[in-house]
Amino acid sequence: MSLNYLDFEQPIAELEAKIDSLKSVGRQDEKLDINLDEEVQRLRDKSVELTRKIFSDLGAWQIAQLARHPLRPYTLDYVRNVFTDFDELAGDRAYADDKAIVGGIARLEDRPVMIIGHQKGRETKEKIRRNFGMPAPEGYRKALRLMEMAERFNMPIITFIDTPGAYPGVGAEERGQSEAIARNLREMSGLKVPVICTVIGEGGSGGALAIGVGDKVNMLQYSTYSVISPEGCASILWKSADKAPLAAEAMGIIAPRLKELKLIDSVIPEPLGGAHRDPLAIGASLKAQLLADLADLDTLTKAELLDRRYQRLMSYGYA
């Protein structure tokens, strides 16, 4: 399977191409007197070393590219790898079922939880059906319906954030996009069950915040969280999207910086090369973090849970 190497990964791609070429030669002519195994292993070791070197010094713009990687695991991938017995729930009971938001009941280590997350698409048809992970108001109203259901049945809520932003179309605005986002922000702050939010890819503006108010907010190592995309910021400040790398650095969109500012709680390490290189490994790391967060929140009474969430929200800007 092609890993869809990004521009800054091209030296790695060239090494991997050499490895594939040598392996292909070995398969085509098994009678070769030359043993290629040692050379293949040498190149593999070199590839790992090069990958480690490149990924040890990534800039914010490179991380933004990784956050958008077409093979990066999406919400439904984590549902399969982390949870069991998932039963998807659909519709906002008012207008439509927005496929850019998925949600339903599942089990985390036999414990019922409510899962809600953005869902992008892989192939063209699915991308269109999912609206490229940009929810309309009915998506956020569906999310709120599921949150209220979780509260009614005393189930923890686990959200996965991965969107370039809420859909800015005319129809979405006519149906109350800003109201839907604002209502979610208000209602999530008062939910009487644990809420754990994790940014797994792009955390774009209000579209991310609408399912991002929680007791714990985590980010994967190569995810981003920002009020606007680097391209959008560059277009406003420098009148050119070409300045996106400069904007990404200035905006502080990466996980370590956001943890330093106390806007998030934990950074979940990704496998070498990014989450798409080993979906099962990142699934295991995510599961461990979710279980640890739930264990911490389970020690609180409902009053303590709400008070701690309130204090957490009010502390923003005082890092």
From Swiss-Prot:
SUPFAM superfamilies, A to Z: ClpP/crotonase
E.C. numbers: 2.1.3.15
Ranges of residues in domain CoA carboxyltransferase C-terminal: 35-296
GO cellular component: acetyl-CoA carboxylase complex
Pathway in which the depicted protein is active: Lipid metabolism; malonyl-CoA biosynthesis; malonyl-CoA from acetyl-CoA: step 1/1
Keyword Lipid metabolism: yes
Cystine pairings recorded for this chain: none
Alphabetical GO biological process terms: fatty acid biosynthetic process; malonyl-CoA biosynthetic process
Main location per the UniProt record: cytoplasm
Catalytic reaction annotation: N(6)-carboxybiotinyl-L-lysyl-[protein] + acetyl-CoA = N(6)-biotinyl-L-lysyl-[protein] + malonyl-CoA
Subunit structure: Acetyl-CoA carboxylase is a heterohexamer composed of biotin carboxyl carrier protein (AccB), biotin carboxylase (AccC) and two subunits each of ACCase subunit alpha (AccA) and ACCase subunit beta (AccD).
Biological role stated in the UniProt entry: Component of the acetyl coenzyme A carboxylase (ACC) complex. First, biotin carboxylase catalyzes the carboxylation of biotin on its carrier protein (BCCP) and then the CO(2) group is transferred by the carboxyltransferase to acetyl-CoA to form malonyl-CoA.
Protein name, as recorded: Acetyl-coenzyme A carboxylase carboxyl transferase subunit alpha
Species name: Erwinia tasmaniensis (strain DSM 17950 / CFBP 7177 / CIP 109463 / NCPPB 4357 / Et1/99)
Gene name of the record: accA
